[in-house]
Amino acid sequence: MNYPVEHYPIDRVRADFPILQQSVNGQPLAYLDSAASAQKPLAVIDRERDFYLHEYAAVHRGIHTLSARATSAMEEVRAKVATFIHAASAEDIVFVRGTTEAINLVANSYGRTAFQPGDNLVISEMEHHANIVPWQMLAQARGLTLRVLPITDDGELDMAQLPALLDERTRLVAVTQVSNVLGTVNPLAEIIRQAHACGAKVLVDGAQAVMHQAVDVQALDCDFYAFSGHKLYGPSGIGVLYGKSELLQAMPPWEGGGAMIREVSLTQGTTYADPPWRFEAGSPHVAGIIGLGAALDYVSALGVDAIQAHEGLLMRYALASLAEVPTLRLYGPVHRQGVIAFNLGRHHAFDVGSFLDQYGIAIRTGHHCAMPLMSRYGVPSMCRASLALYSCQDEIDRLVAGLHRIHRLLGE
């Protein structure tokens, strides 16, 4: 169901999240740190608990009823994920611990076979460290050149620079769909078009996008897509890597162990399972997978379009309200999604965040695992408030009031 904006059931939604009902430092909790990790609805908590109470067993390893039931439940979630991001097949979905592991899997598997010394790959200046460091490591190990697409002062990718970074030896472009600091929504269709035109593949970091907007990996025509469950109202420790079937089929395994093999012989060597199981060595986080399925059900029941409209209204309200705070500097473009980065005068982000915490307001402070982006703006850290499907206008009002109060107390 997609609710009209004026009928978005915010009170009911907030009631679904028990943690939001508490007080912090004597004040009602205003949780504005969902970009770091989102809170969990009762539907997810109850489903995971019920799985442990009544269904838990090792998957893909037993013929008994509980094992078969747990295996079936896990594979149903794989199919549910495929439907949620419009993948062609459930077998294009690999379960991992999170976005970071998904990117490392591509770097250590696809990277081992697709790159030769002298090749290059392209990332952007706004990437999370998880989409920088694995490629630096691969470049060092394989003798590659890592090229960087810069950003403009407004926090947009400088797309005019992209053609000069792409050539016949570009093997991969790795880019975020939405910046975890600036909220910039990147022009993926154009990036993918240009990359494919020179024969390069594209990996999309969807960690900050999949909870805010509909994702269609086939329409995007991306080659890899990664996201985490804990930012999508699901459990921690579970994530997803989508890969085009022909790429996954050609990739060697990264980790070895149980479940990812077809045949093991001490004399003949080992043959490997087909994807996606080839990339799922060891015992999976099956309860987390079940919880992720419940999170997808919850989001789908509300409607992604309704969530996006609700958050869009809140974002516009927040940006307009924050613009009235003296000495506050906003970072990033006007049109953004999910997050608002700012600093208050000359005050360190840590101090601002500490004061807000005393008022019951939770935000993120620091470099946000994006040190190159901090360097681009010449600051060591930023404050970041982030929105979710349970965010409300009262939380924005309290954030703005808290910042006004800090300005009065501390001055410029």
Swiss-Prot record:
The keyword Cell wall biogenesis/degradation does not apply. Its cofactor is pyridoxal 5'-phosphate. GO terms for cellular component: cytoplasm. GO terms for molecular function: cysteine desulfurase activity; pyridoxal phosphate binding; selenocysteine lyase activity. The active site is at C369. GO terms for biological process: cysteine metabolic process. Gene3D superfamilies: Aspartate Aminotransferase, domain 1, Type I PLP-dependent aspartate aminotransferase-like (Major domain). It catalyses: (sulfur carrier)-H + L-cysteine = (sulfur carrier)-SH + L-alanine; L-selenocysteine + AH2 = hydrogenselenide + L-alanine + A + H(+). Homodimer. Interacts with SufE and the SufBCD complex composed of SufB, SufC and SufD. The interaction with SufE is required to mediate the direct transfer of the sulfur atom from the S-sulfanylcysteine. Cysteine desulfurases mobilize the sulfur from L-cysteine to yield L-alanine, an essential step in sulfur metabolism for biosynthesis of a variety of sulfur-containing biomolecules. Component of the suf operon, which is activated and required under specific conditions such as oxidative stress and iron limitation. Acts as a potent selenocysteine lyase in vitro, that mobilizes selenium from L-selenocysteine. Selenocysteine lyase activity is however unsure in vivo. This is Cysteine desulfurase. It comes from Dickeya dadantii (strain 3937). The gene is sufS.
